[in-house]
UniProtKB/Swiss-Prot annotation:
This is Methionyl-tRNA formyltransferase. It comes from Acidothermus cellulolyticus (strain ATCC 43068 / DSM 8971 / 11B). Gene3D superfamilies: 3.40.50.12230. One of its GO terms (molecular function) is methionyl-tRNA formyltransferase activity. (6S)-5,6,7,8-tetrahydrofolate binds at residues 109-112. The keyword Iron does not apply.
Amino acid sequence: MRLLFAGTPQTALPSLRLLLESSHEVVAVLTRPDAPAGRGRTPRPSPVALAAEQAGLPVLKPRRLADPETLAALRSLNAELAVVVAYGALVPEPALAIPRHGWVNLHFSILPSWRGAAPVQHAILHGDEVTGATTFRLEPDLDTGPIYGTVTEPIRPDDTAGDLLNRLARTGARLLLDTVDGIAAGVLAPRPQPTEGVSYAPKITPADARISWSSPAFHVDRLIRAVTPEPGAWTTLAGRRIVLGPVRLAEPQHAPGATDDGSLAPGEIRVLAPGEIRVERDRVLVGTATTPVILGTVQPAGRRAMPAEAWARGARLAPGARFE
């Protein structure tokens, strides 16, 4: 079957590579325009564009899919089916009508849960234990089309969004190929999405990724993992922005005075106010609304990430120092 592949980030590469190795013919790749990247903000092609160029495929980078010249270019490809993996823009109705078998999208959730731009991040943020991937037929509305197939993936307690997305990209690629095979053979028909269990996963902005230390420890942990690596969880210290990597929960929490001299008994943790930092010999604790969390990595503005203990030694924190 003649395929048009639409995708942009690294996440789409396992699907593109698997389709290129299959019996199907990828006739062209559709991706987002070159975007500024790096410190110099120099425009760079997307990971999918680079992979397509290396494979000798034609690459289309339109700013608007609805432009007449873009629609004409899509028609000229004579693609029988278009497949989408994290393309990064809605496909308008005139484009949806071009391939004979329509457009199939690989979405990283079990639809109808977490429709939208950030399904993996929201699954972690809300404490889901299982997620997955879904192939479905694109419609004009957001992630509402009938479903071809699904695959499930457990969410591990220490998963970041990056970890989980990497696994889903691989398992989803196989699901996508199976879907394309089924459509090509005429043996796979989509079924309507369930009307119950609909939830939405809007894009998470840098503002959303700011840590609220007045939240419970479990929420701080989930937020940090949900926005790692992008956009990155952050806080401030003395007005300066600091990015934090995943944390561990410190259990249990006790008030001081557990021993006769007021010191802490082995394994006990002094109560900390939300955001308050306590530096110990082999760990750095921060208070939340419940139990403290143990910091993993710390990245001050303009510097590389480092272990929290190394950061604390160099920061020379005053007693009672607190993240805002």
